[in-house]
């Protein structure tokens, strides 16, 4: 089963978690908030900030994820791209994501 790491578990982000599960992914959510609804839907939850690149990297590496998604979260987009690049996963180029964040 493929694994996907989703950065954030807020109510808005549960849409992506549910969609990934429906597509057959093992879902892993990381969020620094201890009681977001996504953690109750995901297959696994980590209490880590979605902007902490090193924490995200360690989780993604440990879990052997096939992809990283920052859905409905501008602050998590760049960390997702940086970590995906480091792990050789499909992603938008981190430099492009960084530039797009300068809005």
Name the predicted role of every residue range.
Residues 96-103:
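Short beta-strand to alpha-helix junction loop
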